[in-house]
């Protein structure tokens, strides 16, 4: 097209696989690459007008800002969930929520209680947003390297875990499968890495904290750490959870909750479905047809999990995916050349390693799926005391959700409802 003046400014050339089931030469090695069916590479020419929208309009900007504000609210609600089993937090929250100013003046005690409540919510809310920003920066840096434009992120609020992630769309066609792969995997890779670092650093702060500091940390049942194989192995290096009863409470630094939630959000986004990061990686490595088959199997697995004892998180996530991210993404301009001929095995290894990390996090020691936070205990629940006299493990009191906080406590069951224990 370069030989014709002005042609390259009006037309875009694509190299795409055309799948055929008959009349193919089986000796042609190129037609068996990366798919279950045979294909022939064909050139396709499109007008440059047939392209994704390359700039955000006012409506998109307003919608994106609204998503950001809503996500900020749900992250604060999730912060309330995370702290809901800490007696001190509940007492302060009740004081701040129930106080009525006399003569238009709020007491100093009430103001102090409100400040303490907010100070415990801020690390969780902004920690979650920070990890998501790191995830999105991974996409943007890779897109910049490959001269590809992507949209501003549209954040997905969640009442279960604060934030499900974000949606980023391609605003120009990726140049190749390699570009698609690098852009897609860079977000989850950065998100997994920083979430893991936050979890480990939070555990270090937990171990080194004084008893007074621990009293201000979120409390979760020790059995929570067995809800994920990967999480159990990491936490067991720092806390003596293997010697504690599952229903005893463990106090953890807020960064642990933030890191674990970040791992979950990145794992969900790396599922190989449609326009999710995992779906884009699958399409870059295996082609569109293979990616569609993998997505179908994954969707069936997600649907089955809805009827199991898995977290309701997966129900809300699959609904979002089906309505927003189910369809295949736009193709790269070169959709035939492998991800990288000389680095093909390394690219595949990175993809499988990330998928294995996702599976290790999502599968628990008991066969159920991972949950981010425990369900607030009811007044009839009797918790077993911890057997280990460590400061980070404490007997659980009977904690009931307060009426003023009940709308905010949207946690989901951990593994199963705790059985009453006679003490």
Q: Where in the sequence are the language-model features?
A:
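Hydrophobic transmembrane alpha-helices and their immediate loop junctions
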Residues: 1-423
């Amino acid at each position: 097209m370069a030989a014709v003046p002005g042609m390259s400014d009006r037309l875009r050339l694509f190299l795409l696989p055309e799948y055929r089931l008959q009349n193919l030469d089986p000796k042609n090695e190129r037609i068996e690459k990366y798919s279950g069916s045979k294909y022939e590479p064909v050139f396709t020419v499109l007008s440059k007008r047939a392209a994704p929208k390359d700039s955000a309009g006012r409506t998109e900007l307003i919608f994106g800002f609204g998503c950001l504000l809503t996500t900020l609210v749900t992250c604060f609600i999730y912060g309330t969930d995370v702290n809901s089993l800490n007696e001190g937090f509940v007492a302060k929250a009740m004081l701040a929520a129930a106080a009525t100013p006399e003569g238009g003046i709020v007491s100093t005690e009430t103001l102090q209680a409100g400040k303490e409540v907010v100070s415990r919510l801020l690390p969780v809310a902004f920690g979650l947003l920070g990890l998501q920003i790191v995830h999105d920066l991974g996409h943007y840096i890779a897109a910049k390297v490959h001269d590809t434009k992507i949209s501003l992120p549209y954040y997905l609020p969640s009442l279960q875990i604060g934030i499900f992630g974000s949606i980023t769309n391609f605003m120009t066609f990726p140049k190749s499968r390699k570009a698609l792969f690098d852009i897609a995997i860079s977000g989850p890779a950065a998100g997994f890495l920083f979430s893991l670092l936050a979890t480990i650093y939070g555990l270090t702060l937990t171990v080194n904290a004084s008893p007074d500091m621990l009293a201000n940390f979120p409390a979760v049942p020790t059995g929570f750490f067995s809800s994920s194989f990967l999480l159990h192995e990491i936490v067991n290096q720092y806390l003596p959870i293997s010697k504690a009863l599952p229903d005893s409470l463990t106090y953890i630094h807020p960064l642990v909750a933030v890191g674990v939630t970040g791992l979950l959000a990145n794992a969900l986004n790396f599922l190989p479905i449609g326009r999710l990061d995992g779906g884009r990686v699958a399409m870059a490595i295996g082609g569109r047809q293979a990616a569609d088959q993998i997505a179908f199997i994954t969707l069936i697995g997600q649907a089955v999990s809805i009827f199991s004892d898995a977290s309701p998180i997966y129900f809300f996530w699959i609904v979002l995916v089906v309505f927003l991210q189910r369809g295949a993404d736009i193709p790269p301009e070169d959709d035939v050349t492998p991800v990288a001929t000389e680095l093909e095995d390394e690219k595949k290894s990175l993809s499988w390693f990330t998928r294995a990390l996702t599976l290790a996090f999502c599968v628990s020691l008991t066969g159920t799926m991972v949950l981010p936070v425990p369900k607030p205990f009811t007044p009839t629940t009797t918790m077993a005391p911890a057997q280990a006299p460590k400061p980070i493990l404490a007997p659980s009191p009977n904690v009931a959700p307060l009426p003023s906080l009940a709308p905010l406590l949207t946690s989901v069951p951990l593994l199963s409802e705790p059985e009453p224990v006679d003490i």
